[in-house]
């Protein structure tokens, strides 16, 4: 039972099981957290980190592991999420310019994004699980998947050929 | 940005490029500028000033990663300004020089046989603990010069060093997955027949082991059906020959085994659709969600009033969402978020309150309506009455008990906590 500054009425409620006049005396709680931090690493065990403000995937040892970037995740719909880093202040987006499709980090707050806004669609990724791993397809760029290169320290990017052996599109994606 | 980066790079590596096309886009223009500054462009027309003397060199800071290696093995330090895959396009125009921070002398020194520079990288073979320190790479071309430092720490090859030098890798319980021997590219480059030996706790993993499969020609070890016992320290090693001498290059991996959290379809089990309340009183309506074995972490739970967020609808905070609670009963997971009225007013009787729950599998909603409780209720009369009776009974009981069993103070404690 929580501490309560109106014990009398609490006792009354308790004794008589009066469900309709339940009293809560705890101070108003903080807003429920809609954002969750997830660890992400690819099937080749590469984790994400920033190099010159660019998201790259590679291997971190010893005290370097504190550089690891975790993904901040806000669910949008079943199997669809917004993805960000740095406490949801930088969000992953699929941007098309000309015939080029690329992954971009944008300085927007993940909790300000809305699934109803068309311009926020580029931040939406569709999750699909296979066994223990997850793939991330861009909702704004259908057929384009979040990927890493086989080599370490290369940028995290998007590929439209997920079956190709040169790109890794399967990630372990687990809550902190 | 990266695609642009690579595209532009590939183009620059070629002989011809339309500059006007590149200039059309700002990011690309910025990249050109970057390349000019870096002096790595293959087509830059070099200005004749900037002699590039060491004192004019711009120091661009310390590389964000530290190299942790063990003594007796070869170590390769890469110049952080130049990514290895860019080296071939950069090398015709740029010279790289290395020096150690604590000495002005260049490395390798004249008498030095353990260190040399190859393809811009500093090789140390074999590394000694006293090689630990900060190394500065100076990249210079006709127009520009810049420096960055890299930190190297060479550890004794003992078990005590493992936590400082290991690469953590994670696999999921009861699935199969790979460990990867990292940062070996300098030693396995151009070698299709790379032979990596894998060890667990210093014991060589047998080729015919059903549990572990050393995937030929790759740096990967497949672990079948990962169990908790598979967690721990692994090492992988390749051999490297230099001037007739055989060296071991090893990397250490700490395998952690995680249990994957499963999601289930959440079920809202309370509130009841109609909640009775007296106007002017406080009211808490808990929205309680059953998840079974599913994870609480990915499940969102929130309230709305007439399709408006609670914090927007009641900016004064008369109605507010309480703290989210996550708990388990009999190994089943629940989440609860209360809606708190302080106090209930008539307007609330006509408001459509809704509790929403969402995770990646499902989205559900439940209506809750507040109804005014009858002004006279037996409950309200009985409540103070029963309390008075209870207290009286308690006092009498206490009194009698204290008389009979003096010194048994715990009975009072029991009475206090018993309710």
Swiss-Prot record, chain A:
Keywords, sorted A to Z: Disulfide bond, Glycoprotein, Secreted, Signal
Any Gene Ontology CC annotation: extracellular space
Entry's Gene Ontology BP terms: immune response; inflammatory response; insulin secretion; lipid metabolic process; negative regulation of heterotypic cell-cell adhesion; negative regulation of interleukin-1-mediated signaling pathway; response to glucocorticoid
Chain positions carrying an annotated carbohydrate: 109
Superkingdom, taxonomy of origin: Eukaryota
Compartment annotation: Secreted
Disulphide connectivity of cysteines: 91-141
Gene3D superfamilies: 2.80.10.50
Signal peptide: 1-25
Alphabetized Pfam families for the sequence: IL1
InterPro entries registered for this protein in UniProt: IL-1_CS, IL-1_fam, IL-1RA/IL-36, IL1/FGF
Its job: Anti-inflammatory antagonist of interleukin-1 family of proinflammatory cytokines such as interleukin-1beta/IL1B and interleukin-1alpha/IL1A. Protects from immune dysregulation and uncontrolled systemic inflammation triggered by IL1 for a range of innate stimulatory agents such as pathogens.
Similarity annotation: Belongs to the IL-1 family.
Name of this chain's protein: Interleukin-1 receptor antagonist protein
């Amino acid at each position: 039972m929580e501490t309560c500054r109106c014990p009398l009425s609490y006792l009354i409620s308790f004794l008589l099981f009066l469900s309709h006049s339940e009293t809560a005396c705890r101070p108003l709680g903080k807003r429920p957290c809609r954002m969750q931090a997830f660890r992400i690493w690819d099937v080749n065990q590469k984790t994400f980190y920033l190099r010159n403000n660019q998201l790259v995937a590679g291997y971190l040892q010893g005290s370097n592991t504190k550089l690891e970037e975790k993904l901040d995740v806000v669910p949008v719909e079943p199997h669809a999420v917004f993805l960000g880093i740095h406490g949801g202040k930088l969000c992953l987006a699929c941007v098309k310019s000309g015939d080029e499709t690329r992954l971009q980090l944008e300085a927007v707050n993940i909790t300000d994004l809305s699934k109803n806004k068309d311009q926020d669609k580029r931040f939406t990724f569709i999750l699909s699980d296979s066994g223990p791993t997850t793939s991330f397809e861009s909702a704004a760029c259908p057929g384009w998947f979040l990927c890493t290169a086989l080599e370490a320290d290369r940028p995290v990017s998007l590929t439209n050929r997920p079956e190709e052996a040169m790109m890794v599109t399967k990630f372990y994606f687990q809550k902190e | 940005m990266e695609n642009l980066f690579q595209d532009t790079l590939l183009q620059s590596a070629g002989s011809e490029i339309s500059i006007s096309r590149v200039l059309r886009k700002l990011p690309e223009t910025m990249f050109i500028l970057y390349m000019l500054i870096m002096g790595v462009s293959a087509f830059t027309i070099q200005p004749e000033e900037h002699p590039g003397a060491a004192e004019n060199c711009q120091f661009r800071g310390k590389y964000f990663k530290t190299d942790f290696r063990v003594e007796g093995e070869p170590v390769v330090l890469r110049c952080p300004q130049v990514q290895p895959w860019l080296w071939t396009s950069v090398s015709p125009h740029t010279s790289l020089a290395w020096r150690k921070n604590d000495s002005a002398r260049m490395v390798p020194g004249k008498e030095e046989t353990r260190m040399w520079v190859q393809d811009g990288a500093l090789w140390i073979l074999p590394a000694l603990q006293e090689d630990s320190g900060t190394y500065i790479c100076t990249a210079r071309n006709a127009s520009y010069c810049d420096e960055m430092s890299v930190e190297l720490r060479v550890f004794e090859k003992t078990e005590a060093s493992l936590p400082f030098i290991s690469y953590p890798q994670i696999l999921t319980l009861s699935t199969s997955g790979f460990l990867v021997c990292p940062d070996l590219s300098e030693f396995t480059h151009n070698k299709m027949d790379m032979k990596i030996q894998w060890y667990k706790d210093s014991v060589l993993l047998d080729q015919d082991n059903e549990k572990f499969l050393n995937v030929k020609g790759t740096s990967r070890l497949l672990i079948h059906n990962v169990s908790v016992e598979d967690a721990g320290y692994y090492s992988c090693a390749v051999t490297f020959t230099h001037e007739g001498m055989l060296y071991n290059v090893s990397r250490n991996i700490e395998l952690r085994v995680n249990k994957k959290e499963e999601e289930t379809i959440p079920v809202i089990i309370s509130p009841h659709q109609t909640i009775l309340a007296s106007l002017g009183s406080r009211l808490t309506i808990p929205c309680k969600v059953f998840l079974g074995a599913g994870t609480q972490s990915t499940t969102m739970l929130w309230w709305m009033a007439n399709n408006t967020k609670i914090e927007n609808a009641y900016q004064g905070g008369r109605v507010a969402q309480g703290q989210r609670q996550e708990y388990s009963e009999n190994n089943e997971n629940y989440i609860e978020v209360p809606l708190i009225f302080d106090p209930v007013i008539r307007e609330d009787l006509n408001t459509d309150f809704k509790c929403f729950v969402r995770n990646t599998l499902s989205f559900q909603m439940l209506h809750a309506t507040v109804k005014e409780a009858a002004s006279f209720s037996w409950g309200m009369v009985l409540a103070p009455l029963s309390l008075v009776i209870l207290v009286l009974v308690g006092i009498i009981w206490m009194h009698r008990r204290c008389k009979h069993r003096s010194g048994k103070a715990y009975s009072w404690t029991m009475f206090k906590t018993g309710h």
